[in-house]
């Protein structure tokens, strides 16, 4: 199965108008477990806490 490179961007920092943190990862596009956008809890160094990061498109 092919894997695609995706970028995860912080949603909370974007809403607050602060610098957003971004992470680069891969995902399996044909996976039945994650049909929509990928969401993960990752650390944002600008906010100094763990926040929700969503897949950018």
Swiss-Prot record:
Q: Does the keyword Ribosomal protein apply?
A: yes
Check the record and name the SUPFAM superfamilies matching this protein.
Answer: Zn-binding ribosomal proteins
Keyword tags: Ribonucleoprotein, Ribosomal protein
Q: Which GO terms describe its biological process?
A: translation
Alphabetically, the GO molecular function entries are: structural constituent of ribosome
Q: Which InterPro entries match?
A: Ribosomal_bL33, Ribosomal_bL33_sf, Ribosomal_zn-bd
- Gene3D superfamilies per the UniProt record, alphabetical: Ribosomal protein L33 (2.20.28.120)
Concerning Pfam families, the annotation shows: Ribosomal_L33
Q: Name one GO cellular component term.
A: ribonucleoprotein complex
Q: Does the keyword Ribonucleoprotein apply?
A: yes
So what family is this one in? Belongs to the bacterial ribosomal protein bL33 family.
State the protein's name: Large ribosomal subunit protein bL33
């Amino acid at each position: 199965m092919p894997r695609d490179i995706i970028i995860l961007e912080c949603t909370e920092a974007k809403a607050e108008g602060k610098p957003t943190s971004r992470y680069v990862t891969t995902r399996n596009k044909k996976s039945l477990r994650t049909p929509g956008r990928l969401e993960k809890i990752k650390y944002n160094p600008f906010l100094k806490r763990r926040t929700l990061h969503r897949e950018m498109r």
